[in-house]
Amino acid sequence: MADATTASPSMMTGASDSERIQPKRLFAFIIMVFGMFMAILDIQVVSASLTEIQAGLSASSTEVSWVQTAYLIAEVIAIPLSGFLSRALGTRLLFAISAFGFTASSLLCGFASSIEQMILWRALQGFLGAGMIPTVFASAYTIFPRSKFYIVAPVIGLVATLAPTVGPTVGGYITDLMSWHWLFFINIVPGVIITVGVLALVDFDQPNFALLDRFDWWGLIFMGGFLGSLEYVLEEGPQYEWLQDTSVAICAAICFVSAIAFFWRVLTAEEPIVDLYAFSNRNFAVGCVLQFCIGVGLYGLTYVYPRYLAEIRGYSALMIGETMFISGMTMFFMAPVVGRLMQKVDLRYIIAFGLVTFALGSWQMTWITREYDFYELLLPQILRGIGMMCAMVPTNNIALATLQPDRVKNASGLFNLMRNLGGAVGLAVINEVLNDRTDLHISRLQDRVTWGNTMAVETLNNFAQRLQGMGDSTLMAMKQLSQLVHRQAAVMGYGDAFFMLSLFYVALSLLVLFVNKPPSMAAGGGDAH
């Protein structure tokens, strides 16, 4: 095998040896990037509007949570499948089908009249739209010369990080100004434009329809069982006490059996549905681990911040979106900065700096109180945005830019899958930490709130005086004191979760030691060694 950790001259451009970016290809790529943005945005765009969707469809809180879960499960199955389909159908046809399917299912979601219909169409939306995400990553590293990667990488890195970050903001604004139906209708016009634009402009490669005759249906079934049940366990496990719930236990068993069957099939099939060969490249393997861990923070903090603001501060969806927008703005302005740094600084140093900066932003939140508001969250969110961009963008290059062009399509699906799985695992772990640590703090605080505690007695008396003439003031005061204890315990639980994340990302920064020095982004053509 050729040196798996450095790029050979034959890798440099994929489709072209020219250092000049063809305008047609550039415009086609920009259209594809917008498609990827829509697909990733729709993961989180409904998160701030689930209450409105629940009311509109007369659904229970458990049922409406599946509006997001169904999308995630379908997407995580489809993303690794895109590598095979991209080779069989070609980039043009696969992306057009994906964009059209995403647009059509968005229309169906907007017209859904029951929760069952909504869940079905959301699953279809996630499955069909998922193909756009890894296809953009693969195209970026095969159609552009290496000397232009420092321009292309920040663009796709920005979209991959910005879309889930601003999702709640966009969703909150749309629902507040119009209705939840427009969360889906707003995709229609851009989706049609993207579909037509891709069909007219994309000419990056040629399809190989003969591959469809060798499609591994058993591999698809095993992969669907493995990844779908894994996503379900991670999504539903924390709220149902994991294996104590029958459905979670059954899915865990399906996941275990399907995983064994899937890896056996991938390693023995003549034309496997997923090619694991890319993991023989050390930089790709380490990059996937980094991507998985970056997904923990990307999706984890997109969940933790809004939950704190809603649960402790009582913010509306719109107010939460406005507060969270700071991270998105920081990422936007950091994208060109990171692109410029990639020309001058070793990518490993940029990644390490990004991870430590992200850890610092989380560390500042370990002293969180129930008074933390927009201004207290300002600096941590700025650090989060800086850290995420500095970690994500160079990781994309380290993982994908050193692969042979014919390996990038399969590798891109695996690489993007790691980010989504990292997010799912991160959310499950963060939920578990929040629940366990909150219960622990409630127990400790209750042990201290006794009749012998002067401060507790004074607080209780103050509550009782304010509630005079409103019934049993003593009983109501005790209820208020109990609520105060539970709220304070929850805040302390958030502090513990942020502390855990800060330690995790400091430790993760050491992983860059295992990355072989990547070729310079300023190098072109044969200079990439």
Model-derived features: positions:
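Short helix-capping/hinge motifs at transmembrane helix termini and TM-loop junctions
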Residues: 113, 145, 201-205, 238-239, ...
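Hydrophobic alpha-helical segments of secondary membrane carriers
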Residues: 155-159, 290, 414-418
